[in-house]
């Protein structure tokens, strides 16, 4: 693996990700910042809405934006995973992405199969992490069911991740098996984010305002990633 400092590596990866997005979407983001801790890499993206997407957003076609962007992002993530595995010499376990179109922000979260060298696991926020797990479980129960397992991670002072496993109920599994994965994804996205934003007590847990909440699912692995971005 390259011996360059981790922060320099993150800056390079953020730049390469921006170029990759520009190549595939016709424009790149205004900014892309990388954060790492343990086995996780999070890229926080701002200013990434194309003129066509802006028109669709104004006309209320959010679902069309989401589905078309997901198709292109699957290609981007495949290239990004290959680049990251070469750079860190670690296998990528899973990749997630989500977008807040109204705020023109987004995130890409990568989970490697082991800790990134130089990215030390932060265990200082144990009370915050415990309360975060409890709150995510509470909302998960309202929306669907309690996850079989929930873990929370502090990636940086302003970035937190929550990973849930065993989240799908039987009717959702049947819908996926019958080919309704995209429809289910859009529906879960709208429903869960509504509860997270309007029923969650996350600002009390963090003692700071929350700038963004992102959620993505891997239906085939039956897991989900949530990303909380805090305001400075």
Residue ranges and their predicted role:
Residues 200-232:
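Extended, charged low-complexity segments
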Residues 71-115:
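Hydrophobic, ordered structural segments
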Residues 2-50, 54-58:
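N-terminal ordered "arm"
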Residues 2-6, 28-30, 62-65, 82, ...:
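A cross-kingdom feature marking solvent-exposed beta-strand/loop segments within repeated
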Residues 100-159:
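Surface-exposed beta-loop interaction hotspot
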Residues 35-52, 141-177:
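An N-terminal amphipathic alpha-helical segment
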Residues 50-67, 120-136, 181-192:
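Inter-domain helical "communication" segments and dimerization helices
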């Amino acid at each position: 693996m390259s011996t360059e400092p981790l922060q320099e590596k993150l800056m390079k990866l953020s730049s390469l990700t921006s170029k990759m997005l520009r190549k595939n979407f016709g424009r790149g983001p205004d900014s892309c910042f990388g954060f790492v801790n343990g086995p996780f890499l999070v890229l926080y993206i701002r200013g990434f809405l194309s003129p066509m997407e802006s028109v669709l957003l104004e006309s209320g076609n959010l679902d069309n934006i989401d589905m078309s962007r997901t198709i292109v992002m699957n290609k981007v993530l495949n290239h990004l995973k290959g680049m990251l595995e070469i750079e860190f010499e670690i296998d990528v376990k899973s990749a997630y992405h989500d977008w807040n179109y109204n705020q023109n922000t987004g995130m890409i979260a990568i989970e490697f199969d082991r800790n990134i060298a130089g990215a030390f696991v932060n265990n200082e926020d144990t009370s915050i992490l415990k309360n975060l797990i409890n709150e995510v479980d509470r909302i998960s129960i309202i929306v669907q069911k309690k996850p079989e397992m929930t873990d929370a991670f502090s990636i940086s002072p302003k970035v937190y991740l929550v990973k849930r496993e065993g989240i799908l109920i039987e009717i959702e599994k049947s819908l996926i098996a019958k080919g309704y994965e995209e429809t289910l994804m859009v529906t879960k996205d709208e429903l869960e984010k509504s509860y997270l934003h309007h029923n969650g007590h996350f600002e009390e847990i963090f003692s700071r305002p929350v700038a963004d909440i992102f959620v993505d699912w891997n239906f085939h692995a039956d897991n989900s990633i949530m990303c909380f971005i805090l305001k400075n």
